[in-house]
């Protein structure tokens, strides 16, 4: 199945909106984090046989019109769209989903990220253009949803979703966190193929840098960080040392300009 992963546009006229930041914002420094959650989900779906498309609108400071023009370069009538979100941008993200649904009424649109995970039913209530919410860590959820849609199977059997029902809304069975993170392909390979490392900036790292995950889950409950409570949980999991070193070697051999790796 064709899956279009999108980091939607938001207030492009003011700068680059860093939706992946702990506190999503357009900053004076121009900080822009890589959309790592989208990247890993796209990689996992591609690894499992699905054809992917990817648009990071903030990275190129694209507005809605420019983003929709790029999206329409592909035949997306029956595609699965996966849109990242954040609390500051949620109303704009839903409006963008509406525009996609108007273009492709037979498509299936799923919202992901911290905000819809925390407020799944409320987010679904914003618009009928949104077909589902993927709750929490969504690599496996999106892959399984794409499998079900492609085969015409009952999507209510897919774990990790919030969907509409005759009685309002229903949450399917919980999708357990991925145990073996070595199953995920290298984010750096995806960045090399689909993105440009010079579009991203992390103030604490020497520019240009690359960001990757070496683990997921955090046992702490810092009141300034939403990710353990919404995305990756409190049980720490890590990639193997060999797997991480392999990605470092890939970066060293394929990104001559990169000065630092942020983990």
Residue ranges and their predicted role:
Residues 182, 187-263:
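Radical SAM [4Fe-4S] cluster-binding motif and immediate context
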Residues 37, 41, 96, 244-251:
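Alpha-helical packing segments of well-folded alpha/beta enzyme cores
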Residues 19-26, 225-230:
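Short glycine/proline- and charge-enriched loop/turn segments
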Residues 37, 44-45, 51-180:
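Glycine-rich beta-alpha loop elements in corrinoid/cobalamin-binding modules
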Residues 24-35:
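A short acidic, glycine-rich active-site loop
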Residues 2, 14-18, 25, 164-211:
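N-terminal [4Fe-4S]-dependent radical SAM core
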Residues 4-7, 56, 82-87, 110-112, ...:
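Short beta-strand segments
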